[in-house]
């Protein structure tokens, strides 16, 4: 594919708006269609971002022959339905994180995409961030030795009162899928899938997690990760990776960092950035890095991204399932 990558946006919420804004900065890519449950919402979004076509149903977007790839920006509970609809119509898909409600749904999507030879990627934008990519290079090159501990947290406060989607089990509410997916994905980027999962949580009257603490373990590597997520506590949102020869610290906003600091015995602290890091342009939020990766993969004829591999997304979903099992959170879609 040498021509412009033509995007469709499925859903019109806040993250969809951020996506459309950031895509404006990416040469060779454009949003050509948007869909919502209502035509009114779709038209308003289209007018706001100068999108030529607006649909009041998802099927029309999936059937649009001038759309190459669809960005699924619905709540978690609709990820499987929306992504499957687009894949079955022959569209490539970038699906928001958390990938799905559970590992079973994720496995269904991955099988569908692989069977049809279509591109599918979870929108774990952190993996595409140039600063995070620089960190992973250093760790894999042995800059801090063998990784022994990872610490990361992501907590915010609302208001997220009764009636908010984050309090609704049917919508995959709670801290874990919205925020906990970041520290879990961060740890698994470095260490892979854990073989031990412990967790404790504060649950809401509706049965979703308000605050969850996780301890993940990797027996063979001799490593562990202490992770927290919350929708009732404003945590530092920092991350730290400690190895046998040093430590890497990320300041607040580890999921989209401007820099990190490498500490090694006998050396002065070293600060690392990367070209295009941080805001990466006035008014941008950082989604342009995952957008660029999708465009690169499509032009190369790839059906999976090496930066956000599907097997990695499946492994994260299995960990999230295990955490929910430990803390007693179930969604209606779990059956």
Show where each model-derived region lies:
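Beta-loop-alpha module in the N-terminal Rossmann-like domain of NAD(P)-dependent dehydrogenases
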Residues: 49-111
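Rossmann-fold dehydrogenase core element
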Residues: 108-126, 146-149
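Active-site loop of classical SDR/Rossmann-like NAD(P)-dependent oxidoreductases
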Residues: 277-292, 308
């Amino acid at each position: 594919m040498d021509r412009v990558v033509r995007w469709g946006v499925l859903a019109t919420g806040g993250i969809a708006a951020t996506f459309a804004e950031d895509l404006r900065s990416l040469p060779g890519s454009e949003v050509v269609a948007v869909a919502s449950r209502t035509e009114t919402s779709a038209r308003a979004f289209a007018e706001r971002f100068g999108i030529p076509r607006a649909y009041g149903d998802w099927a029309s977007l999936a059937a649009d022959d001038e759309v190459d790839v669809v960005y699924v920006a619905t709540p978690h509970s609709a990820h499987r339905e929306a992504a499957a609809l687009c894949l079955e119509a022959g569209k490539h898909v970038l699906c928001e994180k958390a990938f799905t409600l559970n590992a079973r749904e994720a496995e269904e999507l991955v099988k569908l995409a692989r069977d049809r030879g279509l591109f599918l990627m979870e929108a774990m934008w952190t993996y595409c961030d140039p600063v995070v990519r620089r960190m992973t290079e250093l760790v894999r090159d042995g800059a801090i030795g063998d990784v022994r501990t990872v610490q990361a947290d992501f907590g915010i406060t609302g208001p997220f009162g009764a009636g908010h989607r984050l309090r609704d089990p049917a919508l995959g509410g709670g801290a874990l899928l919205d925020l906990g997916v970041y520290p879990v994905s961060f740890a698994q980027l470095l260490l892979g899938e854990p073989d031990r999962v412990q967790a404790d949580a504060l649950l809401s009257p509706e049965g979703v997690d308000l605050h969850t603490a996780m301890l993940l373990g990797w027996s063979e590597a001799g490593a562990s990760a202490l992770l927290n997520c919350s929708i009732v506590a404003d945590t530092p949102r920092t991350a730290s990776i400690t190895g046998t020869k040093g430590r890497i610290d990320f300041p607040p906003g580890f999921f989209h960092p401007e820099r990190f600091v490498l500490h090694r015995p006998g050396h002065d602290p070293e600060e690392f950035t990367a070209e295009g890091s941080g805001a990466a342009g006035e008014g941008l939020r950082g989604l342009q890095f995952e957008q660029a990766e999708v465009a690169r993969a499509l032009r190369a004829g790839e059906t999976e991204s090496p930066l956000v591999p599907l097997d990695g997304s499946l492994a994260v979903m299995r960990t999230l399932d295990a955490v929910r099992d430990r803390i007693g959170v179930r969604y209606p879609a779990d059956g």
